[in-house]
Amino acid sequence: MIALDAFAASVTTDQPPAGSSPALQALWWARRGDWARAHECVQAHEGEPDCDSVHAHLHREEGDLSNAGYWYRRAGRPVSQQSLEAEWTALATELLGPSR
C-alpha cells in the first residue's frame, strides 16, 4: 500500500490512488476539500467500521457534533479529542497500515 506522505500528496491528482478502500477514498476527497463527495463514499458503506469512523470525522469537520457522536458510537470509537488534522492523519495511517 501507499505511504502516508504519498497518499496525502496524491490529492493533487484527479482521483484517489488505485485500490483505495472507500474509507480512504473519503479521506482523500475530504483532503481535497470536497466534503460532499467524501460523504457519499462513506454513506454508501454504512455499517463498515472504517467508513463509520471516517463518517464521524466528516461530521465533526462540518461542526455537526451530535451526528459525529452517533457515527463514533456506530464505529465503536470514543469521540475524538484530537485536532481535525491529527485525526485525519491517524485515520489515514490506520487505513494505510500494513495489516490492511
Language model: regions and residue ranges:
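Inward-facing hydrophobic residues that define packing positions of alpha-helical scaffold repeats
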Residues: A8, A23, W35, V42-Q43, ...
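Solenoid-like repeat scaffolds
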Residues: A9-P16, E40-P49, G76-S80
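Solenoid-repeat scaffolds in large eukaryotic assemblies
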Residues: R37-A38, A68
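TPR/TPR-like (Sel1-like) alpha-helical repeat modules
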Residues: G47, R60-Q82
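Terminal, low-structured helical/coil segments at or just beyond the last alpha-helical repeat
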Residues: L84-R100
